């Protein structure tokens, strides 16, 4: 497969890795298979990435930049607490749905047997998202004069667990059960429950 001059080799390797994660669910990706997919030798892969762990870190950096920058935009543009929560959850689910191979990284499925620091980085990413949700929920008291009856940390954890569960179903179903399926109805129910708490 020829690489257009506009796409650098490093990006192409990461795109091929994400594609292989999507088309080979449940299978471990070896550098030999990846090199074959990219159309280069394993040595050529290692000229761009010193290890397979660094390749996965490249994908994780893409995930972090994509999600956290968009969450910051949501925080700047939207002031309503419930709408912010909805948009953050929707962002996670749409991102996973549009990037099935990368959803395996988010879920941790693709990281089994890989370097522990990769799973740690994904855990840290989800902790940052949970902290954002907690902040959104805590600001409700400041913005609207009324908070929740339940601790915001517990509510933030519940919201994140919902999104992680939908992503896990997507991966487990080999990308057949879309994370956004029924989201609007589910969100209405969740929002109603949150406003009652």
UniProtKB/Swiss-Prot annotation:
Q: Name one GO biological process term.
A: negative regulation of division septum assembly
What are the protein's UniProt keywords? Cell cycle, Cell division, Cytoplasm, DNA-binding
Give the PROSITE patterns listed for this entry. HTH_TETR_2 (PS50977)
The places in or outside the cell where this protein is found are: Cytoplasm, Nucleoid
A GO term from the CC aspect = cytoplasm
Which Gene3D superfamilies does this UniProt record tie to the protein? Answer: Tetracycline Repressor, domain 2 (1.10.357.10)
Does the keyword Cytoplasm belong to this entry? yes
Keyword Cell division listed? The answer is: yes
Pfam families in the record = SlmA-like_C (PF22276), TetR_N (PF00440)
- According to the entry, every stretch annotated as the HTH tetR-type domain falls at 7-67
Q: Which parts of this chain does the entry mark as a DNA-binding region?
A: 30-49
Q: Name one GO molecular function term.
A: sequence-specific DNA binding
Domain of life of the native organism: Bacteria
Q: Which SUPFAM superfamilies match?
A: Homeodomain-like
> What family is this?
Belongs to the nucleoid occlusion factor SlmA family.
What is known about what this protein does? Required for nucleoid occlusion (NO) phenomenon, which prevents Z-ring formation and cell division over the nucleoid. Acts as a DNA-associated cell division inhibitor that binds simultaneously chromosomal DNA and FtsZ, and disrupts the assembly of FtsZ polymers. SlmA-DNA-binding sequences (SBS) are dispersed on non-Ter regions of the chromosome, preventing FtsZ polymerization at these regions.
Q: Its quaternary structure?
A: Homodimer. Interacts with FtsZ.
PANTHER family from the xrefs?
ACREF/ENVCD OPERON REPRESSOR-RELATED, ACREF_ENVCD OPERON REPRESSOR-RELATED
Protein name, entry field: Nucleoid occlusion factor SlmA
The organism encoding this protein is Shewanella sp. (strain MR-4)
